[in-house]
Amino acid sequence: MNPRTAREQTPIVAVSPYGVDGASSRVRLHDWFDHTGLPAEFHSYLGTSNNQVGTVVRRLPAVLAAEASLRRLSHHVGDRTVILSREASPFSSGGIESSILQHAGHSVYDFDDALYADGTAAMSRIWSKRETWIRSLGAADVVIAGSDILADAADEFSDSVIVVPSCIEPDDYLVKQDFGIGSAPRAVWIGSPATEAFLQDIAPALLALHERYALRLTVISAGQADLGPLGGLVDRVPWTRAAFAAELVKGDFGVMPLPDTPYTRGKCSYKLLQYAAAGLPLVGSPVGANAGVLARLGGIAATTPDEWVATMSSLIELGAPARAAMGGAMRSGVVEEFSYARWSSRWLGALDITEKV
């Protein structure tokens, strides 16, 4: 297939398990097409932000239609470029995905989680995410992994693996301007309901700082789960595309705790990138890609409860000019190292497209 410019490009077939409100599909597909201006024909399973059992059960007619549509799709992509993110269907062990990828004129498989280590979801015990991942790797012409760790895992099953990290669009973020801390310093955490549980790893540190400094924690999420002992210091804010940026800059620093497991080592540090894009100082667990992102952006790594207390205390006690300098460095670093503009050549190359002249 000869590379074509975006001006000559027929719509790319983009297949994903979630709609634009699903973080992975938004960051790995939708935002790329918005950035490049490439035309796309999107095929998301139900168009929802997740495919959990409750979501699927409430939409059985739409599920049947989605399954039929995906089975037809492989017969209509013979001269098309296809990019498939993660999986096409939660009711698959790779047969649907490999068929679509193998029938495409040029096929790309993209993943940003350790799907090979994810057996937590109820449906994955029947329809294996690992098997879907393996078969998709073998079927695709090019594989895009979201981190070096994920790429190393994929190398066993594909000889055409490249790394494109999760990226941010700088203009989508407000940048913090006021670095003064009032009577109650504020940490901020943003993420999906499924990852809220990771906050429990730093609950003792957060509670200690709540007692010492009256620390508050803003949780920007679609979730409503009980956060146990953290409930007294948490202020929940619903995640929306229209409002998340304004909520981020209200924080004094961002936090990204992660336990160290085979699955979490595949996380692609998107929370850290979002905090940095907002000009926030940041603290994170040096697990998986986090270690490299923290080092490149100048963030602070913390592992033990005592380290979390010490690092967050140090940020609270810094003067406003020092916090502003740290936040400015974060913003500059993320724009330079993790923006869509920085990685567009590699991403377009994976799709066999040359950049616009």
Q: What kind of feature is each model-predicted range?
A:
Residues 1-84, 89:
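N-terminal pre-catalytic "stem/leader" segment of glycosyltransferase-like enzymes
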Residues 20-38, 42-49, 169-175, 180-250:
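Conserved catalytic-core segment of nucleotide-activated headgroup transferases in glycan assembly
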Residues 27, 321-352:
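A charged, aromatic-enriched C-terminal amphipathic alpha-helix characteristic of glycosyltransferases
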Residues 67-79, 91-92, 96-109, 113-115, ...:
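Membrane-proximal helix-turn-helix segments that form the acceptor-binding/catalytic region
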Residues 115-116, 138-175:
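Donor nucleotide-sugar binding/catalytic pocket of nucleotide-sugar-dependent glycosyltransferases
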Residues 146-151, 220-227, 285-289:
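Short, polar loop motifs at secondary-structure junctions
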Residues 197, 241-242, 246-247, 252-277, ...:
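Nucleotide-sugar-dependent
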Residues 295-306, 314-320:
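Conserved acidic donor-binding segment of nucleotide-sugar-dependent glycosyltransferases
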